[in-house]
């Protein structure tokens, strides 16, 4: 379990090192883009976690499926927010350093969610809630933009 928590911490440290060296650099649009992505990502995480917490209070048995709020557009909006945060950190850090290797950090975090966390939770939910299959057909696994586009062009 410690390794799971160490990996994201290592990536943060790795990604932020160049910023510490070059913080006196003048501002440009990528700094603001990175900062904006971080803020939006954090807000998505906070809002989706609050929505999930409220849903679990109403449905303590763990058998229901949340399909309201942000969860109406993404099956994992909290993870989407987390991934957006990491890409924001990359854009912010890249604007200070210009180091292409920093791209490894958000790619690693995205891969960790896409190939480990999300599949694990999807399998776990399907075991206890077979009706989740219908939700999977309607709502994209991660990207709310895809759900929105599908709905716009479907009807």
Predicted region positions:
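Hydrophobic transmembrane alpha-helices
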Residues: 9-51, 56-155
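Alpha-helical membrane-spanning segments of integral membrane proteins, especially the hydrophobic core
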Residues: 1-5
């Amino acid at each position: 379990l410690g390794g799971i928590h160490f990996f994201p911490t290592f990536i943060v440290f790795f990604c932020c090192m160049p910023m510490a060296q070059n913080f006196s650099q003048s501002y440009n649009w990528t700094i603001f883009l990175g900062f904006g992505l971080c803020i939006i990502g954090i807000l998505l995480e906070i809002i989706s976690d609050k929505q999930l917490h409220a849903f679990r209070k109403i449905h303590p048995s763990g058998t229901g499926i949340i399909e309201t709020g942000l969860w109406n557009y993404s099956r994992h909006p909290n993870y989407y927010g987390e991934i957006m945060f990491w890409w924001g950190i990359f854009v912010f850090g890249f604007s200070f350093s210009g180091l292409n290797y920093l791209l490894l950090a958000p790619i690693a975090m995205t891969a960790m969610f896409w190939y480990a966390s999300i599949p694990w939770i999807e399998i776990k939910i399907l075991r206890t809630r077979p009706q989740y299959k219908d939700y999977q057909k309607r709502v994209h696994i991660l990207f709310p933009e895809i759900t929105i586009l599908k709905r716009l062009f479907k009807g």
